[in-house]
Protein backbone atom coordinates (compact mmCIF):
# COMPACT_ATOMS: atom_id res chain seq x y z
CA UNK A 1 0.00 0.00 0.00
CA UNK A 2 1.38 3.38 -1.05
CA UNK A 3 1.03 6.13 1.55
CA UNK A 4 0.17 9.40 -0.18
CA UNK A 5 0.50 12.73 1.58
CA UNK A 6 -1.91 15.34 0.23
CA UNK A 7 -0.71 18.95 0.33
CA UNK A 8 -3.52 21.41 -0.33
CA UNK A 9 -6.12 19.04 1.11
CA UNK A 10 -8.79 21.72 1.65
CA UNK A 11 -8.55 23.20 -1.85
CA UNK A 12 -10.68 22.20 -4.82
CA UNK A 13 -8.11 19.77 -6.20
CA UNK A 14 -7.42 18.32 -2.75
CA UNK A 15 -11.10 17.73 -2.06
CA UNK A 16 -11.50 16.01 -5.43
CA UNK A 17 -8.54 13.72 -4.69
CA UNK A 18 -10.10 12.79 -1.33
CA UNK A 19 -13.34 11.96 -3.13
CA UNK A 20 -11.60 9.80 -5.78
CA UNK A 21 -8.80 8.05 -3.89
CA UNK A 22 -10.95 5.03 -2.97
CA UNK A 23 -11.05 4.11 -6.67
CA UNK A 24 -7.37 3.16 -6.35
CA UNK A 25 -6.85 0.00 -4.29
CA UNK A 26 -3.04 0.19 -4.04
CA UNK A 27 -2.78 3.57 -2.28
CA UNK A 28 -4.32 5.64 0.50
CA UNK A 29 -4.12 9.17 1.92
CA UNK A 30 -1.83 8.84 4.95
CA UNK A 31 -1.38 12.52 5.81
CA UNK A 32 -2.89 15.90 4.94
CA UNK A 33 -1.54 19.44 4.93
CA UNK A 34 -3.21 22.73 4.08
CA UNK A 35 -2.39 26.43 4.09
CA UNK A 36 -3.67 27.03 7.63
CA UNK A 37 -1.23 24.50 9.12
CA UNK A 38 2.14 25.49 10.56
CA UNK A 39 4.94 25.02 8.02
CA UNK A 40 6.91 22.97 10.55
CA UNK A 41 4.08 20.42 10.42
CA UNK A 42 5.54 19.51 7.02
CA UNK A 43 8.18 17.48 8.89
CA UNK A 44 5.76 14.80 10.15
CA UNK A 45 3.70 15.19 6.99
CA UNK A 46 6.66 14.09 4.85
CA UNK A 47 7.75 11.47 7.40
CA UNK A 48 4.36 9.72 7.17
CA UNK A 49 4.24 9.72 3.35
CA UNK A 50 5.87 7.60 0.64
CA UNK A 51 4.96 10.22 -1.93
CA UNK A 52 3.33 13.65 -1.74
CA UNK A 53 0.82 15.12 -4.16
CA UNK A 54 1.06 18.90 -3.91
CA UNK A 55 -1.77 21.17 -5.04
CA UNK A 56 -1.11 24.04 -2.67
CA UNK A 57 0.70 27.36 -3.13
CA UNK A 58 4.20 28.27 -4.33
CA UNK A 59 4.98 29.79 -0.91
CA UNK A 60 5.35 26.41 0.83
CA UNK A 61 7.37 24.68 -1.88
CA UNK A 62 10.85 25.35 -0.49
CA UNK A 63 10.04 23.94 2.97
CA UNK A 64 8.15 21.03 1.42
CA UNK A 65 11.20 20.12 -0.66
CA UNK A 66 13.55 20.42 2.34
CA UNK A 67 11.48 18.04 4.46
CA UNK A 68 10.94 15.68 1.52
CA UNK A 69 14.72 15.46 1.11
CA UNK A 70 15.10 14.79 4.84
CA UNK A 71 12.68 11.84 4.73
CA UNK A 72 13.35 10.67 1.15
CA UNK A 73 9.73 11.35 0.18
CA UNK A 74 8.87 11.41 -3.52
CA UNK A 75 7.03 14.44 -4.90
CA UNK A 76 4.26 15.00 -7.44
CA UNK A 77 3.94 18.76 -7.91
CA UNK A 78 0.81 20.14 -9.55
CA UNK A 79 0.88 23.60 -8.01
CA UNK A 80 0.83 26.35 -10.63
CA UNK A 81 2.15 29.89 -10.51
CA UNK A 82 5.72 28.73 -9.87
CA UNK A 83 8.57 31.15 -10.59
CA UNK A 84 12.06 30.38 -11.98
CA UNK A 85 13.43 30.12 -8.42
CA UNK A 86 10.98 27.30 -7.69
CA UNK A 87 12.04 25.33 -10.76
CA UNK A 88 15.67 25.68 -9.69
CA UNK A 89 14.73 24.15 -6.32
CA UNK A 90 12.95 21.27 -8.06
CA UNK A 91 15.87 20.63 -10.41
CA UNK A 92 18.33 20.56 -7.51
CA UNK A 93 16.15 18.26 -5.38
CA UNK A 94 15.57 15.93 -8.34
CA UNK A 95 19.24 14.93 -8.17
CA UNK A 96 18.30 13.12 -4.95
CA UNK A 97 14.56 12.44 -5.27
CA UNK A 98 12.23 11.31 -8.04
CA UNK A 99 9.97 14.31 -8.67
CA UNK A 100 7.20 14.73 -11.22
CA UNK A 101 6.06 18.23 -12.12
CA UNK A 102 3.21 19.08 -14.44
CA UNK A 103 1.01 22.16 -14.71
CA UNK A 104 -1.75 19.88 -16.00
CA UNK A 105 -1.97 16.16 -15.30
CA UNK A 106 -4.98 15.30 -17.44
CA UNK A 107 -4.53 12.90 -20.34
CA UNK A 108 -6.32 15.26 -22.74
CA UNK A 109 -4.16 18.31 -22.02
CA UNK A 110 -0.97 16.32 -22.46
CA UNK A 111 -2.30 14.82 -25.69
CA UNK A 112 -3.00 18.40 -26.83
CA UNK A 113 0.66 19.23 -26.14
CA UNK A 114 1.77 16.21 -28.17
CA UNK A 115 -0.52 17.07 -31.11
CA UNK A 116 0.56 20.71 -31.07
CA UNK A 117 4.20 19.68 -31.28
CA UNK A 118 3.47 17.48 -34.30
CA UNK A 119 1.24 20.06 -36.01
CA UNK A 120 3.76 22.89 -35.72
CA UNK A 121 6.38 20.71 -37.38
CA UNK A 122 4.13 20.20 -40.40
CA UNK A 123 2.67 23.74 -40.56
CA UNK A 124 6.03 25.45 -40.40
CA UNK A 125 4.96 28.84 -41.81
CA UNK A 126 1.78 29.28 -39.72
CA UNK A 127 1.42 31.83 -36.92
CA UNK A 128 0.63 30.28 -33.54
CA UNK A 129 -1.51 31.76 -30.74
CA UNK A 130 -2.83 30.27 -27.49
CA UNK A 131 -6.06 31.29 -25.76
CA UNK A 132 -6.80 29.97 -22.26
CA UNK A 133 -10.04 30.41 -20.32
CA UNK A 134 -10.63 29.73 -16.62
CA UNK A 135 -13.09 30.57 -13.85
CA UNK A 136 -13.22 34.06 -12.36
CA UNK A 137 -11.34 33.08 -9.18
CA UNK A 138 -8.20 31.62 -10.72
CA UNK A 139 -5.24 33.50 -9.27
CA UNK A 140 -2.47 33.01 -11.84
CA UNK A 141 -2.51 34.25 -15.41
CA UNK A 142 -1.60 32.95 -17.89
CA UNK A 143 -2.33 29.43 -16.70
CA UNK A 144 0.44 26.95 -16.06
CA UNK A 145 -0.96 24.75 -18.81
CA UNK A 146 -0.85 27.58 -21.36
CA UNK A 147 2.78 28.22 -20.45
CA UNK A 148 3.53 24.49 -20.73
CA UNK A 149 1.96 24.37 -24.20
CA UNK A 150 3.75 27.52 -25.33
CA UNK A 151 7.12 26.28 -24.07
CA UNK A 152 6.65 22.95 -25.88
CA UNK A 153 5.97 24.74 -29.17
CA UNK A 154 8.62 27.42 -28.61
CA UNK A 155 11.34 24.80 -28.08
CA UNK A 156 10.27 23.02 -31.25
CA UNK A 157 10.27 26.13 -33.44
CA UNK A 158 12.66 28.54 -31.73
CA UNK A 159 9.97 31.10 -30.88
CA UNK A 160 9.70 33.76 -28.21
CA UNK A 161 6.71 33.61 -25.85
CA UNK A 162 4.69 36.83 -25.50
CA UNK A 163 2.14 37.33 -22.71
CA UNK A 164 1.11 40.94 -23.29
CA UNK A 165 1.59 42.17 -26.84
CA UNK A 166 0.11 45.59 -26.08
CA UNK A 167 -0.08 47.99 -29.02
CA UNK A 168 2.80 46.61 -31.05
CA UNK A 169 2.39 44.40 -34.13
CA UNK A 170 3.05 40.69 -34.05
CA UNK A 171 6.61 39.68 -34.86
CA UNK A 172 7.47 36.66 -36.98
CA UNK A 173 9.26 34.63 -34.31
CA UNK A 174 6.78 34.65 -31.46
CA UNK A 175 3.89 32.75 -29.95
CA UNK A 176 1.30 34.76 -28.03
CA UNK A 177 -0.76 33.75 -24.99
CA UNK A 178 -4.08 35.43 -24.17
CA UNK A 179 -6.21 34.84 -21.07
CA UNK A 180 -9.92 35.02 -20.27
CA UNK A 181 -11.35 34.87 -16.73
CA UNK A 182 -15.02 34.53 -15.94
CA UNK A 183 -17.90 32.35 -14.87
CA UNK A 184 -17.30 28.85 -13.54
CA UNK A 185 -15.18 27.55 -16.43
CA UNK A 186 -12.91 24.71 -15.32
CA UNK A 187 -10.29 24.90 -18.06
CA UNK A 188 -10.23 25.56 -21.80
CA UNK A 189 -7.06 25.74 -23.88
CA UNK A 190 -7.07 26.51 -27.60
CA UNK A 191 -4.05 26.52 -29.89
CA UNK A 192 -4.68 28.31 -33.18
CA UNK A 193 -2.40 27.80 -36.17
CA UNK A 194 -3.16 30.67 -38.52
CA UNK A 195 -2.18 30.55 -42.18
CA UNK A 196 -2.98 32.93 -45.02
CA UNK A 197 -5.83 30.76 -46.30
CA UNK A 198 -6.95 28.63 -43.36
CA UNK A 199 -6.95 28.31 -39.58
CA UNK A 200 -6.53 25.10 -37.62
CA UNK A 201 -7.55 25.07 -33.95
CA UNK A 202 -6.62 22.40 -31.41
CA UNK A 203 -8.77 22.55 -28.29
CA UNK A 204 -9.01 20.83 -24.91
CA UNK A 205 -11.79 21.49 -22.40
CA UNK A 206 -11.91 19.94 -18.94
CA UNK A 207 -15.51 19.48 -17.81
CA UNK A 208 -14.51 18.91 -14.17
CA UNK A 209 -11.43 18.28 -12.05
CA UNK A 210 -11.57 14.47 -12.19
CA UNK A 211 -9.14 14.13 -15.10
CA UNK A 212 -6.54 16.24 -13.27
CA UNK A 213 -6.68 14.27 -10.01
CA UNK A 214 -6.73 10.86 -11.70
CA UNK A 215 -3.56 11.86 -13.50
CA UNK A 216 -2.00 13.03 -10.23
CA UNK A 217 -2.79 9.80 -8.38
CA UNK A 218 -1.52 7.68 -11.28
CA UNK A 219 1.64 9.79 -11.30
CA UNK A 220 2.21 9.11 -7.60
CA UNK A 221 1.89 5.36 -8.22
CA UNK A 222 4.13 5.48 -11.31
CA UNK A 223 6.86 7.34 -9.43
CA UNK A 224 7.39 4.58 -6.85
CA UNK A 225 10.14 2.62 -8.61
CA UNK A 226 11.76 5.51 -10.47
CA UNK A 227 15.28 6.84 -10.03
CA UNK A 228 15.94 10.44 -8.95
CA UNK A 229 15.10 12.84 -11.80
CA UNK A 230 12.65 15.59 -12.69
CA UNK A 231 9.88 13.88 -14.66
CA UNK A 232 6.89 15.15 -16.63
CA UNK A 233 3.63 13.55 -17.77
CA UNK A 234 5.25 12.93 -21.15
CA UNK A 235 7.70 10.59 -19.40
CA UNK A 236 4.78 8.50 -18.16
CA UNK A 237 3.28 8.24 -21.64
CA UNK A 238 6.65 7.47 -23.25
CA UNK A 239 7.33 4.78 -20.63
CA UNK A 240 3.91 3.19 -21.19
CA UNK A 241 4.43 3.22 -24.96
CA UNK A 242 7.82 1.53 -24.67
CA UNK A 243 6.28 -1.25 -22.55
CA UNK A 244 3.70 -1.88 -25.28
CA UNK A 245 6.26 -2.13 -28.10
Curated annotation (Swiss-Prot):
Coiled coil: none annotated. This is 4-hydroxy-tetrahydrodipicolinate reductase. Pathway: Amino-acid biosynthesis; L-lysine biosynthesis via DAP pathway; (S)-tetrahydrodipicolinate from L-aspartate: step 4/4. One of its GO terms (cellular component) is cytoplasm. NAD(+) binds at residues 8-13, 78-80, 102-105. It comes from Rickettsia akari (strain Hartford). SUPFAM superfamilies: Glyceraldehyde-3-phosphate dehydrogenase-like, C-terminal domain, NAD(P)-binding Rossmann-fold domains. NCBIfam families: dapB. The lineage of its organism: Bacteria, Pseudomonadati, Pseudomonadota, Alphaproteobacteria, Rickettsiales. GO terms for molecular function: 4-hydroxy-tetrahydrodipicolinate reductase; NAD binding; NADP binding; oxidoreductase activity, acting on CH or CH2 groups, NAD or NADP as acceptor. Catalyzes the conversion of 4-hydroxy-tetrahydrodipicolinate (HTPA) to tetrahydrodipicolinate. It is found in: Cytoplasm.
